[in-house]
């Protein structure tokens, strides 16, 4: 079992006791900028959202970062978001071939001072 320790930029592996209860937590990997959502692929790699870096980090079963994907590329000509902007969680499709990512970025073309009556 894994816990994202967002404030301390790390992932904690929680060992499971023989009776199924939670055991001791040990540092699994550190140095990720605000790890948040996590999904596990068919090779037991963790795919972790590092939302303050606007990227997805792939961590192998030993805790080593083996890949980084995505980033924030700015705005397109029409003002919409290009890339990840504070992604939060992710999940693989049942067959493991598609990765779904929630992106907290909002396209708000009307954003500006509120007019109150």
Give residue ranges: language-model regions:
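A short beta-strand motif characteristic of beta-propeller blades
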Residues: 23-30, 65-80
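Structural signal for beta-propeller blades
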Residues: 9-12, 54-57, 107-109
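Beta-rich, blade/repeat-based domains predominating
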Residues: 1, 29-47, 53, 76-97
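Blade-level signature of beta-propeller repeat domains, shared across WD40, Kelch, NHL, RCC1
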Residues: 89-117
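Short loop/turn segments immediately following the C-termini of beta-strands
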Residues: 5-7, 51-52, 61, 104-106
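Short loop/turn segments immediately following beta-strands, especially the blade-tip
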Residues: 14-21, 61-64
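Oxyanion-binding "anion nests"
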Residues: 2-15
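A detector of repeated loop/turn-to-beta-strand junctions in beta-rich toroidal repeat architectures
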Residues: 8, 22, 53, 115-116
